[in-house]
Swiss-Prot record:
Entry superkingdom: Bacteria
Protein name: Urease accessory protein UreF
GN (gene name): ureF
Pfam families in the record: UreF
Subcellular location: Cytoplasm
C-alpha cells in the first residue's frame, strides 16, 4: 500500500467524514434498553459479535464484490447487487441508515470528483444507493486493494460502534480505546473471512439485530436514529 492509498482510506474511515455515521448505533442502543449490554465488557462482546456475525458474513463480502464490480464497471451487476443488499435490511431504520449514509457518501464523491466521470454517472444512477456500494466506489476510485478497503470499512464501523457505546452505556474514553484495541485482530479475521466468501454465500440473516432495530423504532428514549 502506498502513502496516497493509505491517506485516502484513513479519510474514508474517519469519523469526520460528513455522512452522518455518528447518528446511528445499529441496534446497540436497543440492546442497552433490552438490557443485553450493561458495561464495557458487554459492549465489547456486542460489537465483537456484530463484527463476526453480521459484517464478516454480509456487509464486508458484499463490499468486496462491489469493489470488483466498480473496477470492471459492470453497471447492471452493481445496481442489481445494491438492490439485493437494500432489500436484505430487516427494519425500516436499518434500510434508512444505509440509504442515507450511502447517498451522503455518493454526493461527497460527486462533489470531490472522485473516480472517472463514467463511473460517477453510474453511481448517481443507482437509486437508494447503499453505504457499502458507495464506499466501494470511493475505495476503487483511490485504487485501494480489497483487503485494505475492507479493513478501513470494518475499522470505521468498530470505531463508530465504540463511540455509540461511550455515549449510551456510558463508558469512559479509556474503556472505549480498550474495546478498539481488543478488536484489532477480530477485524483482521473478519476481512480474511469476507475475502474468501463467494457472492452466493453472503449471509445477511441477523434476526436478533432485526428485532432490536424494530423495537428501537418505538423505544421511549433514544439518542440515535438506529
Amino acid at each position: 500500500m502506498d502513502t496516497a492509498e493509505l491517506v485516502a482510506l484513513l479519510h474514508l474511515a474517519s469519523p469526520a467524514l460528513p455522512i452522518g455515521a455518528f447518528s446511528y448505533s445499529q441496534g446497540l442502543e436497543a440492546a442497552l434498553d433490552a438490557p443485553l449490554i450493561r458495561d464495557a465488557d458487554g459492549a465489547r462482546d456486542w460489537i465483537a459479535s456484530g463484527l463476526a456475525d453480521v459484517l464478516a458474513q454480509g456487509e464486508l463480502p458484499f463490499l468486496a464484490h462491489q469493489l470488483a464490480r466498480w473496477h470492471a464497471h459492470d453497471a447492471a451487476a452493481l445496481a442489481d447487487a445494491n438492490d439485493e443488499f437494500v432489500a436484505s435490511r430487516e427494519s425500516f431504520e436499518l434500510r434508512r441508515e444505509t440509504e442515507q449514509m450511502g447517498w451522503s457518501l455518493a454526493q461527497l464523491c460527486a462533489s470531490l470528483e472522485w473516480g472517472d466521470a463514467a463511473r460517477r454517472a453510474t453511481l448517481a444512477s443507482i437509486p437508494s444507493v447503499a453505504l457499502p456500494s458507495a464506499f466501494a466506489f470511493a475505495a476503487a476510485a483511490h485504487g485501494a486493494t480489497p483487503d485494505a478497503a475492507l479493513a478501513a470499512y470494518a475499522f470505521g464501523w468498530v470505531e463508530n460502534q465504540t463511540a455509540a457505546a461511550i455515549k449510551a452505556v456510558p463508558l469512559g474514553q479509556l474503556a472505549g480505546q480498550k474495546i478498539i484495541v481488543a478488536l484489532r485482530e477480530p477485524i483482521r479475521d473478519a476481512v480474511r473471512r469476507a475475502l474468501a466468501t463467494p457472492p452466493e454465500a453472503i449471509n445477511t440473516f441477523a434476526p436478533q439485530l432485526g428485532i432490536l432495530s424494530a423495537r428501537h423504532e418505538s423505544q421511549y428514549s433514544r439518542l440515535f436514529r438506529s
